Amino acid sequence: ESSPKPEFTIGIVDDVTNLSLSYDADRVSESNQVTRAVFYGLGSDGTVGATKNSAKIIGENTPLHVQGYFVYDSKKSGAITVSHLRFSPQPIQSTYLIQKANFVACHQFQFVDRLDMLELATPGATFLLNSPFSADEVWQQFPVAMQQQLIEKKLKLYVVDAAKVASDAGLAGRINTVMQT
């Protein structure tokens, strides 16, 4: 006969107290109505501010509930930033960073070689990449591990030269306006 454990940990391997419970790391505990978006940027590139603006616009102008978490270095300028944005027709009860995103955006092409941005992408998710390379050229720029994840997870890949779009629209240097549209 099994009985409930009065004390336990989930999500870490607790080799000190041995109170860890196993769990399904691929399970998404949120409703499928929750949009979970993660934006990778560089400190002072405007990604965090643009994501905060998107959250405000969604929260004030739609019936959707919205939540944002922002991870960045205290030095801010030049460090990697990760913005986590959720929105849903139902109240959002999640009090943690997004672990399974159905939308991932990379505002800095240089991250392709430095970060595993697709780790958080769920199968079938959308990946939006700011790239100076065209859709025909970009595949060869990806590390093999990234190519494999795109294929295995059946991700939808969208490539935009946000710097060119912004410049053509008279918004030179404002890539985040393009990437958040």
Label for each model-derived stretch:
Residues 1-36:
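Flexible inter-domain linker/hinge segments
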Residues 33-43, 47-181:
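Active-site cofactor/cluster-binding pocket
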